Amino acid sequence: MTKLLVLYYSMYGHVETMAHAVAEGARSVEEVEVTLKRVPELMPEEIARNAGAKLAQEAPIATVDELPEYDAIIFGTPTRFGNMCAQMRNFLDQTGKHWMSGALIGKVGSVFTSTASQHGGQETTITSFHSTLLHQGMVIVGVPYSCQALLNMNEITGGSPYGASTLADADGSRQPSENELTIARFQGEHVAKFTKKVVE
């Protein structure tokens, strides 16, 4: 059985919604066991609540120790000035022992994100994330243009060959569109199919 983890951080719920879509796509592939988890929050609860954070999220908290158990990990992070968020960075900075032991070498890695606008760092957030995965020896998988939703010119939409993304607007009022969720589901399915072949 191929084991795949969707691991995310979501402050306002946009990445959480995308994560569920990614997991849905991955679950559509037979003989792939999909787990959905999130990284720990760093902000004190009161500060997070005052900032409007969505604190009630069903996904359990992941541990660094469990990462080698999976054949693939699809990471989801909101952008922070074109980079991953501090919560995800803090989590990954604790994976030094996996780097030392080579525990993640050959694992499949993929990334999706959320930004405030079309030009808010969708692609740089994902590509800058890739450097961490490459240092761990992971094999990066994106979203090929066989995903027709990437070619949608009829609306403003996130998504690129680097990975799925959504545009939240500066005030967070915009929720992931059906086109963006389609790309997210495609990414989950594509990574699952690729990983299954690698494991076999």
From Swiss-Prot:
GO MF term set: flavin adenine dinucleotide binding; FMN binding; NAD binding; NADH:ubiquinone reductase (non-electrogenic) activity; NADP binding; NADPH dehydrogenase (quinone) activity
Enzyme Commission code(s) on record: 1.6.5.2
Entry GO CC: membrane
Annotated positions binding NAD(+): 12
Binding site for substrate: 99
List of residues binding FMN: 10-15, 79-81, 114-120, 135
Gene3D superfamilies: 3.40.50.360
Residue span(s) of domain Flavodoxin-like: 4-191
This protein's UniProt keywords: Flavoprotein, FMN, NAD, NADP, Nucleotide-binding, Oxidoreductase
Known cofactor(s): FMN
Signal peptide: none
PANTHER family: FLAVODOXIN-RELATED PROTEIN WRBA-RELATED, FLAVOPROTEIN-LIKE PROTEIN YCP4-RELATED
HAMAP family: NQOR
Family statement drawn from the similarity comment of this UniProt entry: Belongs to the WrbA family.
Name this protein carries in UniProt: NAD(P)H dehydrogenase (quinone)
The species this protein was found in: Nitrosococcus oceani (strain ATCC 19707 / BCRC 17464 / JCM 30415 / NCIMB 11848 / C-107)
Species lineage: Bacteria, Pseudomonadati, Pseudomonadota, Gammaproteobacteria, Chromatiales
